[in-house]
Curated annotation (Swiss-Prot):
Pfam families: Ribosomal_S17e (PF00833). Disulfide bonds: none annotated. This is Small ribosomal subunit protein eS17. The lineage of its organism: Archaea, Nanobdellota, Candidatus Nanoarchaeia, Nanoarchaeales, Nanoarchaeaceae. Keywords: Ribonucleoprotein, Ribosomal protein. Belongs to the eukaryotic ribosomal protein eS17 family. It comes from the Archaea. InterPro entries: Ribosomal_eS17, Ribosomal_eS17_CS, Ribosomal_eS17_sf. GO terms for cellular component: cytosol; ribonucleoprotein complex; ribosome. GO terms for molecular function: structural constituent of ribosome. GO terms for biological process: translation. It comes from Nanoarchaeum equitans (strain Kin4-M).
Length: 72
């Protein structure tokens, strides 16, 4: 079982997901590089948490299980 993500990670990932909806994939490594490019000064741990949560959001979107408030 995984750990619960902190609010800052979720909020940042959601903002990136809304701002750039078409660049995210289910590939963690690709998302990690994109996060690093978009957020210049971010720690390794924070970058990885955001990239992981973005993978989760992409999977939810593909399954049409993404809550409506995430798409606004």
């Amino acid at each position: 079982m995984g750990r619960v993500k902190i609010k800052v990670v979720k909020r940042t990932a959601l903002e990136l997901f809304k701002r750039y909806p078409d660049i995210w994939t289910k590939d963690f490594e690709k998302n990690k590089k994109l996060v690093q490019a978009l957020l210049k000064k971010v720690s390794k741990k924070f970058r990885n948490q955001i990239a992981g949560y973005l993978v989760r959001l992409v999977k939810f979107k593909e399954q049409n299980k993404l809550p409506i408030q995430y798409l606004r």
